[in-house]
Amino acid sequence: MKILVSNDDGVLAPGIKILANELSTLGEVKVVAPDRNRSGASNSLTLTQPLRVKQLDNGYYSVDGTPTDCVHLALTGFLEPIADIVVSGINEGANLGDDVLYSGTVAAAMEGRYLGLPAIAISMVGDNIQYYETAAIIAKQLVIKLSANKLPSQTILNVNVPDLPLSQIRGLQVTRLGTRHSAEPIIKEYDPRGRPIYWVGPPGIEADAGAGTDFFAIKTGHVSITPLHLDMTHYKLFDHLSNLLNEICIEN
């Protein structure tokens, strides 16, 4: 098996090394990841300048681009032969609910799926993460399962793992995305010259976090596994929107 590993925390982040080491027991692992932390990069591609790649002493490839750049690069000609599966992570922090809209970790997995491969995004939930090995072992088991049981097309798995020893994990739950309240306001400061600068505020607290959500699974000590679909079309709105548009008169 050939496994492509990427992330958004950067090629030197602890989570990616632990993940790659664990997955190496299954086959050949190639790591292609950003040269620095690119959290929040979402699905952005670099289109206005070339990408530069540096191979590190440990064999990992460091790219001066986004997580999506890394996977796109790896799967469209940089790596030969092509991988069988993409695993993105292990992210240092949650990707729950609305977080998936901004997450470079999730985006890297989505790019892999967009380019035809099964893909998993895996994140640790907590501060000052201690138990990356827990997520790495779970990722390995999921890769084994997916090698024999293919995901539907355009589907990835978004996996969130409590920062606990494996022995304290209560099980795996299939979940839906919860939601957060709106983000906190921006934080305004001033640089040494007195000019205003702005920091994006922290994410909002949980809004929809009841039973069945990814938030709830984490709170109860479970691993949350949410299937995400690349097709974002809102099919249920078709009839209502069609009726609404029929009321619009366009005159030549």
Curated annotation (Swiss-Prot):
Amino acids binding a divalent metal cation: 8-9, 39, 91
Record key words, sorted: Cytoplasm, Hydrolase, Metal-binding, Nucleotide-binding
GO molecular function per UniProt: 3'-nucleotidase activity; 5'-nucleotidase activity; exopolyphosphatase activity; metal ion binding; nucleotide binding
The keyword Transport belongs to this UniProt entry's keyword annotation: no
UniProt EC number: 3.1.3.5
Keyword hit for Nucleus: no
Swiss-Prot/TrEMBL catalytic activity: a ribonucleoside 5'-phosphate + H2O = a ribonucleoside + phosphate
Family statement drawn from the similarity comment of this UniProt entry: Belongs to the SurE nucleotidase family.
Name assigned to this protein: 5'-nucleotidase SurE
Classification of source organism: Bacteria, Pseudomonadati, Pseudomonadota, Gammaproteobacteria, Legionellales
Gene it is expressed from: surE
